[in-house]
């Protein structure tokens, strides 16, 4: 006598047993990102702003010059978008460097949308 495998439900119309169990993984949320902004002032030389952009944000001269012009014309520019810790560090580095060179350059961060 041949034995049939034992099934959870031998009734084909019974949908209470869906068969496979799946484990749902919780979705990992990405950490919030922060924009680092440079603000225009009437005293910081344009070339100093270019140096800051090259030194602390790794931009080439042309990229740094473009952002410096945006800061000059529009009053501010987004320099980059980073994790909170990186943005905070960059703001502190720029502000410290500007102070040490006696420039009033302002750098801030805000949460990216």
Swiss-Prot record:
Signal peptide: none annotated. Pfam families: ClpS. It comes from the Bacteria. GO terms for biological process: protein catabolic process; proteolysis. Residues 1-26 are annotated as: Disordered. Involved in the modulation of the specificity of the ClpAP-mediated ATP-dependent protein degradation. Binds to the N-terminal domain of the chaperone ClpA. NCBIfam families: PRK00033.1-2 (NF000669), PRK00033.1-5 (NF000672). Belongs to the ClpS family. This is ATP-dependent Clp protease adapter protein ClpS. It comes from Ruegeria sp. (strain TM1040) (Silicibacter sp.). The gene is clpS.
């Amino acid at each position: 006598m041949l034995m049939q495998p034992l099934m959870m439900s031998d009734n084909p119309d019974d949908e209470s047993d869906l068969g496979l169990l799946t484990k749902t993984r919780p979705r990992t949320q990405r950490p919030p990102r922060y924009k680092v902004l440079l603000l225009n002032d009437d005293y910081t030389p344009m070339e100093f702003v270019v140096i800051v952009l090259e030194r602390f944000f790794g931009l080439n001269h042309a990229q740094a010059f473009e952002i410096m012009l945006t800061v000059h014309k529009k009053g501010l520019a987004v320099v980059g978008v980073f994790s909170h810790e990186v943005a905070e560090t960059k703001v502190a580095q720029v502000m410290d460097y500007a102070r040490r060179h006696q420039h009033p350059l302002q750098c801030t961060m805000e949460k990216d949308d």
